[in-house]
Amino acid sequence: VEKFGQQGRGDVAHLQPPVGTPAYRQCRYWMHYAEGSLMNWLVMKLVFVTIPKRPMPFFVRPIARGLCEKVQATLIDPNLQAALAFIEGHLGTHRWFAGPEITMADFQMSFAVEAALARGTQESQYPHLQAYRERLVKRPAYQRAIKLGGPVIMA
């Protein structure tokens, strides 16, 4: 999507703000933030929640569980909460991530937002994040995608 947007091709050119504008810089920032920062914490959370549930010798399980809980409590959870608070703050003053209209950044961030909210994040703690998600899922394009591909399942 980004490559086609940069080349001004197809139906995606309107999803990238004009180069050199503040909205363009925000779009680039949030596109990279999604994969380079937020998803790292979400994937680490998934891994460290999953490890103790995997088959292992009974005497290793308490060690693995304790280690995973400690890593989550001291590293993953504080950083994930800080990232979500940062996003919450941005969405408190912006309808979309990069400008007045939806952009590529919103598509990039949408999965991370869905994943964060599906992983037991207290929705009441992040009302702007929840409102953003609701705006996304109400879009006709989102509804068409769900109709074609099925619902988003965060298993």
Language-model-detected regions and their locations in the chain:
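Short, hydrophobic secondary-structure boundary micro-motifs
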Residues: V12-P18, N40-L42, W96-P100, Q125, ...
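Long hydrophobic alpha-helical segments typical of transmembrane helices together
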Residues: Q122-A155
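Amphipathic alpha-helical packing segments from all-alpha helical-bundle domains
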Residues: A73-H90
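Active-site rim elements
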Residues: K70-D77, W96, R119-Q122
